[in-house]
């Protein structure tokens, strides 16, 4: 049983079903991708650091795995497109890692300094002081809900909506899952908790401690809530001058700007965001966050931000609560095999769910089956949830 039907849960279910498991996916919502994975559109792009840190290398593995999954399951140009992504660092330059003469460059095919022509296409070439940016030729945009739906539609997966899991209880055969009224929802030898921030409460219930630990520090998995809001609107409602200033591909680096894909209404849209607010668990759309997104766009693409300012007065919005972990990496697989045998997690993806969820599902399945890791073994070990149970033991 997988609890959670967003990017994390659907990726876990897909990877297990591909290996012959019969998987039930339970979610409190009546439709898949109802939480953070309902983002209208978002970016898949690598993280870059001057020392090519583990997060950067993990992100490249995530991009590669995600693009392969998108190509296999979704129509290109409709639900995703490998357009490339321009990354403009507003607050500080994002340097590429150095490459010793004669050594292979780890960034080949991934990221290069943006050319003057690309800066001109984004109308960034005349800024003072001069701006710099990176070009990610492998970058893409995607509609995450479409990937969730496609993964859950695979043979061997049964989707069950309106099944809010409130409590777990160990049984001789594995685990029983109950709703808030004590009704049994499912029983299984293996359970994957992929319900975002709700994983904290479900882990507490597995110990018989109710569903809400009193503090984040009291949870064996130190998840933190991270609220985000994006602003979006119809592309054809923008002034002609704003439409003429649109970059030909997505831009990120201080929030992000995308345009051209179909929005929830079916018409081509623009989308800006997202905000980041730690500790806030409200999914209400606010005018303050629309203003914050407009300010981000103003700094990311100054001319376009000025031209689009009136559009934010009528902008629509989407907000959700994601969750992160202190080391900014997801938690995947077994958390504590002695304390919770047969209980696995896939959570803590934060703002990188689009880039890392497919890879995380493959890591979970590889751990279960004793397979070769889908990325460097040392990097795979950094994703395993058991790193937190090891830290908590004397």
Locations of the language-model features?
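Short beta-strand to alpha-helix junction loop
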Residues: 53-62, 92, 133-150, 284-289, ...
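Core beta-strand elements of the Rossmann-like FAD/NAD(P) dinucleotide-binding domain
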Residues: 181-190
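Conserved beta-strand positions in the Rossmann-like core of class I SAM-dependent methyltransferases
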Residues: 24
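Dinucleotide-binding Rossmann-like beta1-alpha1 core, especially the glycine-rich loop
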Residues: 42-131
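C-terminal catalytic lobe of FAD-dependent flavoproteins
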Residues: 138, 305-394
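Active-site substrate-recognition segment that forms the wall
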Residues: 1, 8-19, 28, 36-48, ...
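A conserved short coil-to-beta-strand element within the FAD-binding core of flavoproteins
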Residues: 161-175
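Residue-level detector of alpha-helix initiation sites
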Residues: 6-7, 351
């Amino acid at each position: 049983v997988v609890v959670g039907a967003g990017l994390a849960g659907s990726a876990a279910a897909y990877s297990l079903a591909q290996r012959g498991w019969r998987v039930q996916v339970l979610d409190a919502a009546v439709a898949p991708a109802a939480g953070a994975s309902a983002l209208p559109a978002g970016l898949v792009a690598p993280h870059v650091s001057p020392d090519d840190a583990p997060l950067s290398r993990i992100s490249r593995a995530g991009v590669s795995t995600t693009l392969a999954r998108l190509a296999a399951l979704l129509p290109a140009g409709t639900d995703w497109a490998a357009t490339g992504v321009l990354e403009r660092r507003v607050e500080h330059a994002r340097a590429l890692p150095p490459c010793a003469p004669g050594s292979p460059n780890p960034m080949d095919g991934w990221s290069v300094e943006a050319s003057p022509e690309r800066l001109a296409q984004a109308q960034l070439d005349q800024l003072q002081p001069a701006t710099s940016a990176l070009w990610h030729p492998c970058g893409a945009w995607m509609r995450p809900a479409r990937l969730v739906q496609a993964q859950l539609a695979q043979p061997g997966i049964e989707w069950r909506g309106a099944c809010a899991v409130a409590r777990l209880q160990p049984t001789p055969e594995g685990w029983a899952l109950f709703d808030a009224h004590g009704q049994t929802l499912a029983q299984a030898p293996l359970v994957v908790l992929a319900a975002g921030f709700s994983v904290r409460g479900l882990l507490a219930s597995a110990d018989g401690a109710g569903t809400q630990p009193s503090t984040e520090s009291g949870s064996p998995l130190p998840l933190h809530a991270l609220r985000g809001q994006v602003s979006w609107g119809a592309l054809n409602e923008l002034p002609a001058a704003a439409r003429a200033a649109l970059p030909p591909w997505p831009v990120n680096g201080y929030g992000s700007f995308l345009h051209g894909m179909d929005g929830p209404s079916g018409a081509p849209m623009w989308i800006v965001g997202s905000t980041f607010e730690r500790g806030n668990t409200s999914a209400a759309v606010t005018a303050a966050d629309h203003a914050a997104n407009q300010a981000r766009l103003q700094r990311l693409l100054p001319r376009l931000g000025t031209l689009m300012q009136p559009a934010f007065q009528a902008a629509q919005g989407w907000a959700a609560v994601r969750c992160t972990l202190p080391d900014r990496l997801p938690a995947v697989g077994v958390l504590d095999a002695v304390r919770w045998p047969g209980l696995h997690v896939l959570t803590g993806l934060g703002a990188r769910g689009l880039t890392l969820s497919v890879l995380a599902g493959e890591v979970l399945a590889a751990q279960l089956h004793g397979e070769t890791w889908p990325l460097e073994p040392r990097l795979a070990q950094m994703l395993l949830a058991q790193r937190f149970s090891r830290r908590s033991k004397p």
